[in-house]
Amino acid sequence: MRWPPWASDSQAQQQTAKHDEHDERQAAAKSTTTSKKKDWESSVTAIDWAAFTEARTIIPTLILTSGFLGAFYIHRRYLRRFPDAVSITPSYFRRRSLLGQVTSVGDGDNFRIYHTPGGRLAGWGWLPWKKIPTSKKELRDKTVHIRLAGIDAPELAHFGRPEQPFAREAHQWLTSYLLGRRVRAYIHRPDQYQRAVASVYVRRLLDFPPLRRRDVSYEMLKRGLATVYEAKIGAEFGGEAMERKYKKAEWWAKLRGVGLWKDYRRNKTKWESPREYKTRMGLEEAAQPPVETKK
């Protein structure tokens, strides 16, 4: 039907053709827009898998990954700090050592160290964030309790027990020999008192020859400041060769009558080793009647 009614057939055909042409242009424009949108989305989400197999991608990735894993391994194996003896992993027992600074000496055969893994090469003592604490408050729960392997020193007065002869001299010597110095402790095992039983070595400038590595347990035995560990259970020497060496050092100190062996020959019947002293104290305490508590 012509519209308007008075229009001729040719005019109606021209108008229809214009409308059709307009619709075609809109459809073409819409199709182009949709195609461009799809192309953009596909370009964004497309993954060029071939790029991941190129040398320029693989080599830096391998270097970065290896560096990260290597740094993690070195830190875990060599630079991890143990805050106490309980934290020491079994992989250290009879295999590895701890480097640290002695912060206190509790008795003639035990002391505490602040573990400094890596030593000065790792920045301990000179980097601002690797300073060794000095106050008791700062050191609380941050030191490893070390028990010297292979020896038994005279007992100081504690837990209500009297002081054993020559205990104070042994404690004073060990304090002057180790306090504030860096030592290396070869860990054998933990003991029942949450200490690490270890063979400990120190270097001192004033010793002769200077800076020679000294076995602390051996030095105490030579001076008659301790006896060879006599208990049958829990004895640690670091091997049979070290046990023979310690017994020989004790024999020489006894022969010369130095330290706690001074009155041994004249008073053998009353002379008491640290092991005998602890056994006697244990028997006396066991024989005492239990203390009744007031209700």
Swiss-Prot record:
SMART domains: SNc. Residues 96-263 form the TNase-like domain. Residues 17-27 have a biased composition (Basic and acidic residues). The keyword Cytoplasm does not apply. Gene3D superfamilies: 2.40.50.90. Its main location: mitochondrion. This is Probable endonuclease lcl3. PANTHER family: EBNA2 BINDING PROTEIN P100, SERINE_THREONINE-PROTEIN KINASE 31. Keywords: Calcium, Endonuclease, Hydrolase, Membrane, Metal-binding, Mitochondrion, Nuclease, Transmembrane, Transmembrane helix. One of its GO terms (molecular function) is metal ion binding. Belongs to the LCL3 family. The keyword Hydrolase applies. It is found in: Mitochondrion; Membrane. It holds the Pfam family SNase. GO terms for cellular component: membrane; mitochondrion. Residues 1-35 are annotated as: Disordered. InterPro entries: SNase_OB-fold_sf, Staphylococal_nuclease_OB-fold. The chain crosses the membrane at residues 52-74. SUPFAM superfamilies: Staphylococcal nuclease. It is a single-pass membrane protein. It comes from the Eukaryota. PROSITE patterns: TNASE_3 (PS50830). Ca(2+) binds at residue 152. Its EC number is 3.1.-.-. The gene is lcl3. It comes from Neosartorya fischeri (strain ATCC 1020 / DSM 3700 / CBS 544.65 / FGSC A1164 / JCM 1740 / NRRL 181 / WB 181). The active site is at 147, 155, 195.
